[in-house]
Amino acid sequence: VTKKDAPNIICVLLESFCDPDEIKFLHYNDDPIPTFHELEKNYTTGYLTVPVVGAGTANSEFEVLTGMSMQYFGTGEYPYKTILKKTDCEGTAADLASIGYGTHAVHNNGGNFYSRVNAFSMMGFDTFTSKELMNIQTYTPNGSWATDDILVDETIKTLDSTPDQPDFTYTITVGTHGDYPKEQVIENPKYIANGSFDQETKNQWTYYINQLNEVDTFMSDLIKKVNERDEDTVIVFFGDHLPTMGLQDSDMRSGDIYKTKYVTWNNMG
C-alpha cells in the first residue's frame, strides 16, 4: 500500500489515564481534560477492559497490540519478559508491516523498561525511539518522568521518515505515572481536587488532575500537528490502567476498576 491508499494510524497509550468524571467522589474547579471530552462528543469512544490496575502497563499494551488475553499466561507474568525473549509474535505491527506500513514505537522512558527494546522488534516494529534517543529537557513536578510534550515531534518524525509508506506509530506517554506526592509540589495548581478526603489525599488528586491536563494538552498538540501534514490519519487514545490511588469498583461510574476509556480522532470526514 502507499500513503494514497491507506491512512496513517497512530495508537497512543495514555499512562495511568482516567477520566476524572468517572470517579464518583472526586470534584474539581474546572475540567482538566477538555480535549478528551470534546473528542468524545465528535468521535468514537468507549470503555476498554484491561488486565491490570495501578501498574502493569506492558500487559495492557500486549493485549492491545496482539489481541491476546493475559488469561492465557501465568499469574504475574509479563510476556515481554518471557515468551517474547524466545519467539516473535504476530499483532498489529507485524500485520500492518506485511501490507506495506512503516511501523514505529515511541516512548519517553527507558528502552529496557519491560524489555521493550527486544519485545518491540519481536512484534514487528521497524523502529523504537525511546528516551535515550530524545533530547529530554523537562520533567514532571515529582521529578520522576519526562514530560509528554516531547512526544508530539517524536511521533511526527516517524511519519516523516517514510515518505512513500503509510505508517503505524505506537506512542506511549509517561507524564501521568505515579507516584502522586502527598505534599504539595505544584506551587499554584490550575486544577484543585475536592472531596471527602484528608489534605494529603487532596494533594495527590490535585497533582494527578494537573498531570491529566498536561497529557490532554499533548493530545491537542498532536492532533494539530497531524492536521498540518495533509495526510489521512486515524488516532486512537486509550488509558492503560487506573492510577495507583486505591480505587474500588464502587468508586467508579463504570462499576469496574478494570475499565479505562478510549477515544478516537481522524481527519477523513
Regions found by a protein language model. Give the residues of each.
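Solvent-exposed soluble domains appended to multi-pass membrane proteins
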Residues: 2-7, 11-14, 18-269
